[in-house]
Amino acid sequence: MAYPLLCHYIKAPHSSFPLIPHTSHYILQLVYLHLFHPLPCTQHSHQTMKIEGRRGQMGRLNRAFREKRARFYIFRRCVIMLLRWSD
């Protein structure tokens, strides 16, 4: 997953001021680029996060469904075994 801040740094070298290597200025400039120069890269990362969230939710639902199905199968087999045993 690409980080939006890194993506802005890579795709937006056209900033109105040069990046200063000093850490605090560098971070402030990256934050400025991130906030005031929106690029499709951030939209892509937000969409990716939404899709991953949906996948996680679907994974939990599928896991719960499989567990219920397995329990029902065991219950059904036990009932059949008891019915045949009583004959």
From Swiss-Prot:
Designated name of the protein: Small polypeptide ROTUNDIFOLIA LIKE 2
Function: Small polypeptide acting as a regulatory molecule which coordinates cellular responses required for differentiation, growth and development, probably by restricting polar cell proliferation in lateral organs.
Organism in which the protein naturally occurs: Oryza sativa subsp. japonica
Chain intervals for the UniProt region annotation (Required for DVL/RTFL small polypeptide activity): 56-87
Keywords, comma-separated and alphabetical: Cell membrane, Developmental protein, Membrane, Transmembrane, Transmembrane helix
A Gene Ontology biological process term: negative regulation of cell population proliferation
Record's bilayer topology term: Single-pass membrane protein
Result of knocking out the encoding gene: No visible phenotype.
Family statement drawn from the similarity comment of this UniProt entry: Belongs to the DVL/RTFL small polypeptides family.
Entry's Gene Ontology cellular component terms: plasma membrane
Ranges that cross the membrane: 19-35
Matches recorded under Pfam families: DVL
Main location as per UniProt: membrane
Localisation: Cell membrane
